[in-house]
């Protein structure tokens, strides 16, 4: 079961400038909550499971996008993958998968069908995306972090 990483050291800030509410959420008694989810492996090494903000509840189950993305990236034609949760008309969260496939060798429809078939074989059904979107590149910040909110907004605009 993943847990949230908290850190405490001399170089950790004591809070955010002029943001008392945000400070109170993540700074407690000299500790800082990273909002990063980890487990320990058998050797005591950290295994990263994503940001707590990115964890999704699908069909009553908690789902880490990273687990699905790692499975998607086993397909060697896919260079990048990102999972986001988007609400449907009933307000239920559904998974949308964004992929970058630099050298697609077949139709998008055929590739999508084969990929979903592979995911259904290797993942629980509730972890399988309902829709796949092909992108030329992922939206990234200046520091190279994925902007999942841009992907969610993209789905809403379609």
Residue ranges with predicted function:
Residues 1-26, 61-63:
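Conserved ATP/PPi-binding loop(s) of AMP-dependent carboxylate-activating enzymes
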Residues 9, 14-15, 37-127, 144, ...:
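AMP-binding/adenylate-forming catalytic core of the ANL superfamily
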Residues 155-158:
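A short, polar/charged loop-to-alpha-helix boundary motif
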Residues 142-148:
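Short, low-order "capping/linker" segments at domain edges
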Residues 132-142:
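Short proline/glycine- and acidic-rich turn/helix-capping motifs at secondary-structure junctions
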């Amino acid at each position: 079961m993943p847990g949230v990483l908290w850190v405490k050291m001399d170089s950790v800030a004591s809070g955010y400038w002029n943001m008392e509410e945000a400070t109170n959420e993540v700074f407690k008694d000299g500790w800082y909550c990273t909002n990063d989810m980890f487990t320990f492996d058998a050797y005591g090494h950290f295994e990263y499971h994503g940001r707590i903000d990115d964890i999704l509840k699908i069909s009553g189950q908690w789902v880490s996008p990273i687990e699905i993305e790692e499975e998607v990236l086993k397909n060697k034609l896919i260079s990048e993958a990102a999972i986001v949760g988007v609400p449907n008309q009933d307000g239920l969260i559904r998974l949308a998968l964004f992929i970058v496939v630099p050298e697609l060798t077949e139709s998008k429809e055929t590739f999508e069908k084969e990929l979903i078939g592979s995911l259904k074989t290797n993942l629980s059904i509730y972890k399988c995306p309902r829709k796949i979107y092909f992108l030329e590149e992922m939206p990234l910040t200046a520091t190279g972090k994925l902007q999942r909110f841009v992907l969610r907004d993209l789905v809403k605009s379609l």
